[in-house]
Amino acid sequence: MSRSLSECIDQGRGLVPADLVLKHGRVFDLVTGELVQTDVAICGDRIVGTFGTYAGRREIDCRGRILVPGFIDTHLHVESSLVTPFEFDRCVTPRGITTAICDPHEIANVCGLEGIRYFLEASAHLVMDLRVQLSSCVPSTHMETAGAALEAKDLAPLMDHPRVIGLAEFMNFPGVLMKDPGCMAKLEAFRGRHIDGHAPLLRGKDLNGYIAAGIRTEHEATTADEALEKLRKGMRVLIREGSVSKDLHALVSILTERHAPYLCLCTDDRNPLDIAEHGHIDHMIRTAIRLGAPPLAVYRAASLSAAEAFGLKDRGLIAPGRRADIAVLDSLEGCHAALVLAGGVVADDAAFSARSDVEPVARASVKVAEIAPEAFRCPGNRAETPVIGILPGKIITEHLTAEIEPVDGDKRPDPARDLARIAVIERHGKTGGRATGFVRGFGMARGAIASTVCHDHHNLAVVGIDYADMALAANRLRALEGGFAVAAGGEILAELALPVGGLMSLRPFEEVRDALVTLREAARSLGVTLEEPFLQLAFLALPVIPHLKITDRGMVDVDRFEILP
């Protein structure tokens, strides 16, 4: 909905009525920190007039409201919302999120470039502005079996796509430091372009080396001290609050007006139930202000600083010439959007209904033979056994050990000690490999849960106490083309089909949200105490997050970057 330069000038000068005028509201000026009573004139997709009175062909009364720039989620995986980009758009844009920068590496790990192209094509049809970073680590390491592998030469044809913003989170930070040839080829190919980072707990000179590779932004800081070191060394820090990784409380002390130009907000992984119950970037804004962060710092991080960090110079302020991304709020503290404009378009049912669709990809992606209960045995001769220790609200895990005596050659789950079986089974039709181990922290007393959302290789992951229930849940996902399942006593208690790559539903986000409520209740009936058991399970298989993880190839000591014998 662009207009000619002449039209923009004339409407900005007030010589002719503007296409749209937001009347009588107060604009939160992110440069001066002032709240200013003014009309906002819009021509096509651009703001053309502020700090004055305007007439418009269409006028909306914003009396008693505060206007702020639309919010920017600077790092997320849309697939973690469990819906397609179209439903994600409908779910979060009305909350004020007008730009999102996504890394589609979940779908890319299942079907490669086809998945990235799907996101690029879909992004052209949304109400929000969805930008795509090219997935840097498919697979994330050599210690897993993904459905695809992407090298620098594979990404090169998409580098100059108008909706691409550089290279996505470079998770294989050990590969960067060890100058792995594949990592070096990607870093060289994107030299001078935006490269997003991923370096949990990396400090000192190793962090210097990682940043020197050209990496500019990073979202894995979990303490204020870690975040400050990254800021001091020139990184833009993206404060994260996802459904599992919740770092806002730990980092809110650095969210000051002094630091805000170098801080952004992101959600990384957030599902529709969490969005419905709490919110998205709007939830982060409310929470940060409630915890004492200055509103000016918070709103800068949510828009202006984010735009500048990722080179989106046309947005982030309510000012002439900027993209008309505007959230009309009840208050700065409440951050509830009464009206949202994305590129001058009101984000309402009519706008969402007017979008054209794109055929989804990666159907029938669960390629695994029927699984027998015996597949979940954990053989071993020694009693001393590595155990993944869950830290609620974190994707970092503990590397624990427990004495588990084998019985008939099998180390069995022990719910009395909160020791559940965990298994990962290759599901891309490549090796048929599987690995079993132990996890502590679910609180599970019976039954099993299974998922094909299993970062980042997205193999089939199962946690349980009873092998027969584990097999039942896993086999149910074969029939559903992937998803989530809860089983106990030989019955499926709850399920959610995710047929798009085993990652995303084809249903409206409201139905997915309701299914997650049922799944959560079913998991609790097994004794599970985690708020988000399926997302927590998904991250137990990611071998670039310390300290102990599991993939289809075995238990992974992330600190030593090797598979345990």
From Swiss-Prot:
Its cofactor is Mn(2+). The keyword Hydrolase applies. It catalyses: adenine + H2O + H(+) = hypoxanthine + NH4(+). Its EC number is 3.5.4.2. SUPFAM superfamilies: Composite domain of metallo-dependent hydrolases (SSF51338), Metallo-dependent hydrolases (SSF51556). Keywords: Hydrolase, Manganese. CDD domains: AdeC. One of its GO terms (molecular function) is adenine deaminase activity. GO terms for biological process: adenine catabolic process. It is an enzyme of class 3 (hydrolase). It holds the Pfam family Adenine_deam_C. Belongs to the metallo-dependent hydrolases superfamily. Adenine deaminase family. PANTHER family: ADENINE DEAMINASE (PTHR11113:SF2), N-ACETYLGLUCOSAMINE-6-PHOSPHATE DEACETYLASE (PTHR11113). NCBIfam families: ade. This is Adenine deaminase. The gene is ade.
